């Protein structure tokens, strides 16, 4: 049986390919709404109110995932039901988008910057 290949481009300069069979093991409902390369060997896949942390070098999800988006896992990201998109801007900041709003996230501090969403 021939396997389909899914190619995902997200974040800055991030390209990943895998068979759909392997993608099903990692992405909560197989329809990610946000995918971002965090720049530290990890990528995050968001789907609905959940996300997984993916280890690029080992080509697999980290143990214990998926997890829910909440105040403990993503401080300051208020959209517990999910996001529309996310991008690592390459300057230590990531941007989460939902509807017409966005949140700037400080990657090093691991929390949203004050004054968001905008």
Where are these regions (language model features)?
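Bacterial N-terminal signal peptides that target proteins for export
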Residues: 1-8
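Bacterial N-terminal signal peptides
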Residues: 8-17
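Bacterial Sec-dependent N-terminal signal peptides
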Residues: 16-24
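Disulfide-stabilized extracellular ectodomains of secreted/luminal proteins, especially beta-rich
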Residues: 23-118
């Amino acid at each position: 049986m021939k396997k389909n290949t899914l190619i995902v481009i997200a974040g800055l300069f991030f390209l990943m390919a895998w068979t759909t069979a392997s993608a099903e093991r990692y992405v909560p409902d197989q329809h990610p709404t946000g995918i971002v390369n965090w720049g530290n060997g990890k990528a995050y896949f968001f789907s609905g109110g959940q996300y997984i942390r993916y280890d690029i070098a080992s080509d697999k999800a980290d143990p214990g995932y998926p997890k829910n988006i909440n105040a403990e896992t993503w401080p300051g990201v208020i959209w517990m039901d999910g996001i529309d998109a996310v991008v690592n801007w390459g300057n230590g900041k990531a941007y989460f988008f939902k509807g017409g709003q966005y949140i700037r996230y400080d990657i090093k501090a691991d929390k949203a910057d004050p004054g968001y969403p905008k």
